[in-house]
Amino acid sequence: MAALLLCVGAVAAKKEKKPVQYNEKGEIIKTGLNFGPLPAVAYDADKGFQLGAILQIYNYGDGSKYPNYFNRWYMEASWFTKGSMLFQFQHDNKNLIPNVRWSTSVSYNIDKAFDFYGFNGYGAYYDFERMGLSNDKKAIKNGAEPDPLLYRYNPFYRINKTTLYAKSDFIGHITEDLYWEVGYHFRWYNQDKIDRVSINKKKNWYDTFPSGPDSFANVKQEDMRTELDDRAYMPTLFEQYMDWGIIKSGEVYNKNGKPHMFDSSIRLGLMYDTRDKEGAPTRGIWAEGHVILAPKWLGSSNSYYRYGLTFRNYWPIVDNDVLTFAYRLSYEGTFGKVKGQQNPYYALSYNTIMGNESDKDGFGSYRTTRGIQRTRLVGLDMGLWTVEFRYKFVDFKLWKQNMAFSLTAFTDGSMATRGRDMSFRGEAGSFAGYKAYIEGRYAEVPSKYQERYYKTIDCGSYGEVRSLKEMPHSTFGLGLRFIMNTNFIVAFEYGLPFSRFYKKDSPYYMQDGGGAFYINLGYLF
């Protein structure tokens, strides 16, 4: 943290040459450009180490709008040691077009281990018990023979995803607090099954995910074991959904058989905003609603129509930004039908946003429901809620910058209120595979019952499939934030799902994972 203070403070201080002025709260009024560089360092067992850098630049102009800014630039470049990478650029401009705010963003993301936990929340069982099994490396080091069936199970819930995303949003006044919103959003997807050679790279032979002949691609000759011959190709959940017809081929592959999909949409919306400031608001309402229109004639591979509604409210409990109560209610839904088909699955896994932020992967993880897995909830309609207490326990001036530390206590929640159709539409022979890998048994089922039994996946009938009735996915946690000049905010947060503390005989025990720690930027809202 000390290094962070030195980094951001020194860079920002170099740009401060004018005499210091203060506002009514005793804050230094910032003018001109402020720079906020930050290293991006993290680790993921499937993607490897993340190394990169983030740079935020704020233009406060003559300071007349402080703590709000005139312009903002955000740049990020990150690489992962196993091949994933992220490049992102955002620009938010309030004065280029008179009386119109223009926000644009471009990003390119290669994720070779993107989370995929199925559809409809608890309707897709999460096999946490199998996820927790592994070989005892210490025992193996002392001479014990590894069990080739206790391989790392994480890749079962992963896909290979590359996305190019670009957007341009415009927001203008209708009245003092009411705004219109218009935007164009474009995505190019390359989503397919995992790259097994990459996932198994540099793993011990007994940890490699069963991939048929590919299981041996990165195994040294001296480590080859005959036991590996017994490990047949293990389909991932994504591959099973394809086999069963839950995900249609036309949602993944184009007419040339390539896993390339296009998403071209127009967004129209309204926003009501009475916040006292944008970066860390302490009072006011911020509400918005928009529709997403993505017809084929606009360039989309699959037509769909969605909407998003969000209401945020901020209440000062102790004035002067000391203690704030904030909450958020959000809903993502689907409307209309396109020749009777559902919305394409790849369009459902976002919390959609207009303005100076980009869409967030959801529902699950940092920007939506802290503490549960990324994209744990994917459905046609989904609700989201957040309640926070924000306590700024210290603020000070350093290098002519306004600095503060804040604690956050929060609870998040989300729920799939309308799920995708999970009816079995694949080859009858693949149903046995479903029972083998999801239910853990290989019982033969007469073909005349297979489709009827399979439909129980989204109604939770006992005994046929491991599935649960959907209910709220709730979490709680704490966070610490370093704040510089209101807008540059570095967050450290840890979230835990309530399901982790259910009784072990509860069918919902550990269905949202075991919790997660995050290092990120800003407040969620």
Sequence positions of predicted segments:
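Transmembrane beta-strand segments that form the barrel wall of outer-membrane beta-barrel proteins
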Residues: N34-Y43, N68-T81, F87, I285-P295, ...
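Transmembrane beta-strands of outer-membrane beta-barrel proteins
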Residues: F35-P37, N71-M75, R101-V106, L178-V182, ...
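Outer-membrane beta-barrel "beta-signal"
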Residues: F482, Q511-F525
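Transmembrane beta-strands of outer-membrane beta-barrel pores
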Residues: Y43-A45, I57-N59, A77-G83, N93-N95, ...
